[in-house]
């Protein structure tokens, strides 16, 4: 079984594992947005990254860290984080990959 583990923050990452062995590790694909060049998830790059690391028909699961609002984070910051989390869910749905959520320890 192949597992794609995702830490959904913009500074997060993606790990591809198979049979308890790490095959690849990637930084979260991001791109600049707006006049201030703030970072946002590059969903198209995420799709490409996932497709390059799987074969359709393989037994694959995506595991995403499920995080909640954190004290001290602003509304805008949490909204942007939610957008990234939702985009990751959308990419997995579009690729028809089963997605599971785990709480951070």
Describe the residue ranges of each PLM region.
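Phosphate- and other anionic-substrate recognition elements at nucleic-acid/protein interfaces
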Residues: 1-105
């Amino acid at each position: 079984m192949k597992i794609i583990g995702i830490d959904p923050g913009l500074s997060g990452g993606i790990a591809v594992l198979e049979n308890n062995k790490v095959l690849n590790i990637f930084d979260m694909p991001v791109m600049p947005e707006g006049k201030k060049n703030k970072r946002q998830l590059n969903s198209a790059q995420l799709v490409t990254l996932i497709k390059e690391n799987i074969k359709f028909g393989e037994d694959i699961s995506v595991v995403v860290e499920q995080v909640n609002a954190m004290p001290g984070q602003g509304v805008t910051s949490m909204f942007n984080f939610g957008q990234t989390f939702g985009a990751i869910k959308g990419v997995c749905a579009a690729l028809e990959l089963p997605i599971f959520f785990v709480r951070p320890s």
